[in-house]
Design a protein with these regions (language model features):
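General "foldedness" signal
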Residues: 19-21, 92, 133, 144
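Exposed beta-sheet edge/beta-hairpin loop segments within beta-rich domains
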Residues: 106-110
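Intrinsic disorder/low-complexity signal
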Residues: 17, 63, 73, 127-128
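Residues at structural and domain junctions
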Residues: 8, 104-105
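Short, extreme N-terminal segment that most often corresponds to the first beta-strand
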Residues: 1-48, 162-163
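Loop/helix-junction capping segments adjacent to catalytic residues or to phosphate/diphosphate-binding pockets
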Residues: 16, 112-113
Length: 163
């Protein structure tokens, strides 16, 4: 497994409606989800959702596909935590408190373009949230990076103060 990343929200913990918004963002980006696990949502257990786009599906279904021909920006897996976990709590300076992550993005390595597009859309709806890989990224950080073309493919591993 490669580098993972997390989302944080100050104050009231997230709900299923927040997950619906996240699924909707990916859908508008032409990604399709495996679906929510209603049973785990009701019990508060974490679960994963895979998002893939048509390009990935066509390659996967091709009889002659080569695993190394996949573009990692065509798929991503998230883990949603309906209830906060102490093991996922971090102190977020811009929030001034310790908060739990509610989404973990699995293996973001090679998925930086996909993630940047997602975060740009996400932060329009949730401007106070914070994204973290090695560094903490706010809406302002993502907006600066998104506006600067061509996109830096290694942005998720660099200090946002350098953008």
């Amino acid at each position: 497994m490669g580098a993972s990343a997390s989302m944080f929200r100050k104050g009231k913990y997230v709900t299923e409606k927040d997950l619906d918004v996240i699924i909707d963002i990916f859908t508008k980006m032409k990604f399709y989800a495996g679906g929510k696990d209603k049973e785990k949502l009701s019990t508060g257990e974490s679960f994963s959702i895979s998002f893939i786009n048509d390009n990935w599906s066509r390659k996967w279904d091709d009889d002659d596909y080569q695993w190394d021909s996949f573009d990692y920006n065509d798929n991503i897996i998230i883990y949603f935590y309906p209830k906060p976990k102490e093991s996922h709590e971090y102190y977020i300076p811009s929030m001034g408190e310790t908060v739990p992550s509610y989404i973990i993005f699995e293996d973001i390595s090679g998925r930086e373009r996909l993630l940047l597009e997602f975060l740009h859309r996400y932060f329009k709806l949730f401007p106070e949230d914070v994204f973290m890989e090695e560094y903490l990224y706010t809406k302002d950080d993502i907006d600066k990076l998104y506006a600067k073309l061509p996109w830096n493919e290694l942005w998720a591993y660099e200090d946002p103060k350098t953008f």
